[in-house]
Amino acid sequence: MHIMEGFLPVEHAIGWSVASAPVVAYGLYSINKKIKKNPEQRMLLGVAAAFTFVLSALKMPSVTGSCSHPTGTGLGAILFGPSAVAPIGAVVLLFQALLLAHGGLTTLGANIFSMAIVGPFAAAAVFRLARAARFPFGVGVFLAASLGDLLTYVTTACQLAFAFPDPVGGFTASLAKFAGVFALTQIPLAISEGLLTVVVMNALLRFNREELGSLNIEGNGQEVQA
């Protein structure tokens, strides 16, 4: 998903940065508000950030100019809401660009938009729909994390297709090519991420039940069954 340094045209890089900035700013406000109200949530916020950093650093080669990896943003979206994940993802992506050479500074806005905005908002929406449909809690967690991951890569494929449309088939043909290559690695990774998120949520429900109660997570103290 990390689009590498200098790969996008300048106007695209600027456009994605402008689109991402207000969401990240609102996310900072959201986090500050939540922490002021419940200071004990700092630990869970750190867990969500660490989960995102570790999973998204596990990359493998994929589409030219990008790579495949889990995103780890579904957990934070479920716990704190999608807007709070935007600044977390932004910091994670910035550190990875500077320290691990994953992604880049010029493509930071595009990477934030896909991994730290679209993915978390998709995960949160899927989780709410699953709970409204009375799916088991664990199924909701699994679907949220997995589909949030997949929609992150659909967004990246769209970004690349916009930047590099096919000479004959245009955007649609280019999107099909990018998405097809991503699918080979990302579908198994998304399933794995969903299962791992269920395991982590089980651990949080077991050892941090009190803190989770303040987040209005509807696990009701029960372990998640995937």
Swiss-Prot record:
Membrane topology: Multi-pass membrane protein
GO MF annotation list: cobalt ion transmembrane transporter activity
Biological-process GO terms, alphabetical: cobalamin biosynthetic process
Pfam families: CbiM (PF01891)
Top-level taxon: Bacteria
TM regions (residue ranges): 6-26, 43-63, 75-95, 107-127, 135-155, 181-201
CC terms in the record's Gene Ontology section: ATP-binding cassette (ABC) transporter complex
Subcellular location: Cell inner membrane
Keywords: Cell inner membrane, Cell membrane, Cobalamin biosynthesis, Cobalt, Cobalt transport, Ion transport, Membrane, Transmembrane, Transmembrane helix, Transport
Pathway involvement of the protein, from the record: Cofactor biosynthesis; adenosylcobalamin biosynthesis
InterPro entries attached to this UniProt entry: CbiM, CbiM/NikMN
Subunit structure comment from the entry: Forms an energy-coupling factor (ECF) transporter complex composed of an ATP-binding protein (A component, CbiO), a transmembrane protein (T component, CbiQ) and 2 possible substrate-capture proteins (S components, CbiM and CbiN) of unknown stoichimetry.
Function of the protein: Part of the energy-coupling factor (ECF) transporter complex CbiMNOQ involved in cobalt import.
Cited NCBIfam families: cbiM, PRK08319.1
Family that this chain belongs to: Belongs to the CbiM family.
Protein name: Cobalt transport protein CbiM 2
Natural source organism: Pelobacter propionicus (strain DSM 2379 / NBRC 103807 / OttBd1)
